[in-house]
A protein has these predicted regions:
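Non-catalytic terminal segments and appended small domains
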Residues: 1-148
């Protein structure tokens, strides 16, 4: 059995401890500490949770699937191991019509984002080359593998 990775945390006033709903979940749910109304414009939500992520790892903030079902867009964010401030969630709820009732309120204690802790390769060098090794894909972009 491997030793679990320890990530230290600090809660600011009103912050809610990130939790995994199930032991094998990849991400820790991040909770909104106060009611927030999401609009067309991105809203910055302070979770009031600070982390000390070990060197060689980073945190990725991303949407929970339930947020996507509700039409909420959560921008992906990277938390570097040397950052000690509070985690923020950048979210918006694009409206379909001009009815202000279509905006979504996220209530205190609800979770629309999750935090995934991942390792990364620290010793990386970029090497400028005149040409890159050919592949069967080459420069095929969006939908090049079939897509929808």
């Amino acid at each position: 059995m491997t030793t679990p990775l320890t990530v230290k945390f600090k809660l600011q006033h009103g912050g809610i401890l990130p939790l995994k709903a199930h032991q094998d979940d990849a991400g820790f749910d991040l909770f909104v500490p106060a009611d927030v109304k999401l609009t067309d414009d991105p809203v910055v939500i302070d979770t009031k949770v600070c982390l000390e992520i070990p060197t060689g790892y980073f945190g990725m903030v991303t949407a929970r699937s339930s947020a996507s079902l509700r039409g909420i867009d959560v921008s992906v964010g990277i938390i570097d191991s040397n950052y000690r401030g509070p985690i923020h969630i950048l979210a918006r709820r694009p409206k379909v019509s001009y009815d202000p009732a279509e905006y979504e309120t996220v209530y205190a204690g609800q979770s629309i984002a999750q935090l995934i802790i991942m390792p990364y390769e620290r010793n990386v060098l970029l090497s400028k080359e005149a040409a890159l090794t050919p592949t069967d894909r080459q420069d095929g972009r969006f939908g090049s593998s079939g897509g929808i």
